[in-house]
Amino acid sequence: MNKLLMALALGAAGTAWAQMTPVGVWHSIDDKTGETKAEIRLTEADGAVRGRIEKLLRKGADQAARCIDCEGDRKDQPVLGLEIIRGARKVAGKDVWEGGKILDPENGRDYTLRLTPVEGGRKLEVRGSIAFIGRTQTWVRVQ
């Protein structure tokens, strides 16, 4: 009985910890319209978070759209499958990931990135900024 309780407690603790990470699948929500825009998968490798667009969810979205305004290796790449988050790393002692970039495929611009899981990891505050000017979207966890 004690072993069962211990296993359940450890499993619950692991689940709670795992949710306070940006890693997972998220619905990006337009901060201006409240509309669900896309499904984004965030992964972590070598301590850095990356994110790709897995599904375009906006009504009437062009599933064959390309990032014509992007630069470098993302120039003219399909938006579906496009890596829009690169290089965010966890800040020591905090549930915050910074130091990376987020791409807005609608204008091809990269912004300084901050990711902050909130509400027990059910939501993710995604802040993109240039200098002191920026905006925050709240994404909703899918899985």
Regions found by a protein language model. Name each.
Residues 14-18:
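Sec/Tat signal peptide C-region and signal peptidase I cleavage site
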Residues 45, 118-120:
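Structural motif
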Residues 52, 125-127:
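Beta-strand residues in well-ordered beta-sheet regions across diverse protein folds
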